Design a protein with these regions (language model features):
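Carbohydrate-active enzyme catalytic cores, enriched for enzymes
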Residues: 1-10, 61, 67-166
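Active-site core of glycosidic bond-cleaving carbohydrate-active enzymes
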Residues: 1-72
Length: 166
């Protein structure tokens, strides 16, 4: 459902997540980040953050008790994916970069991340009410915010849109 997200309806994702989430053991260092992404996609932001923190803390808090054997590099990458694909709602379906950002549950929470896409650097900053897209490097980049197409250029590098997801 994550990798081929456009092949599932929102309702199918929600039904599947609600069915499988209680059955999933979560005993892999890779479970939490993907569970967080799907939780965010189906609108359960609090659960997304809970799963996301488990991925982030995998090594920092020695969750599995095995950091002495080495770091969980894939879980670290999964933490970034949870932030960008999960809470940021980033997708690259059919070669089109789009975002369906989720509203953070905390009043003062801000999520900011860079994305390099086709040689252009985009910064995404998600606040409580708005998301700001800024073209940091490059000439021109077309993205989608939910269903709206946005053209960012050197002359007009910034766009602010309301956050409706979450």
């Amino acid at each position: 459902m994550f990798l081929l997200g456009d092949a599932f309806t929102a309702e199918a994702k929600k039904r599947n997540f609600e069915f499988y989430d209680p059955l999933t053991t979560g005993d892999s260092s890779l479970s939490s980040c993907v569970e967080a992404i799907i939780a965010a996609q189906v609108g359960d932001v609090e659960k997304a953050i809970r799963y996301g923190l488990a991925a982030i803390l995998m090594d920092l808090a020695n969750v599995g008790g095995n950091v002495k054997d080495g770091c969980h590099i894939a879980s670290m990458g999964g933490s970034w994916m949870m932030m960008t694909y999960g809470l940021g709602g980033m997708r690259d379906d059919d070669g089109n970069l789009s975002f369906w950002p989720r509203r953070a549950p905390e009043d003062n929470a801000i999520l900011r991340f860079p994305v390099t896409y086709r040689g252009q650097m985009l910064e995404v900053e998600i606040g409580l009410e708005n998301v700001k897209y800024t073209l940091r490097e490059g000439i021109s980049l077309t993205i989608r915010h939910e269903t709206e197409e946005i053209q960012l250029t050197r002359e007009n590098p910034e766009s602010v849109r309301p956050v409706s997801g979450g």
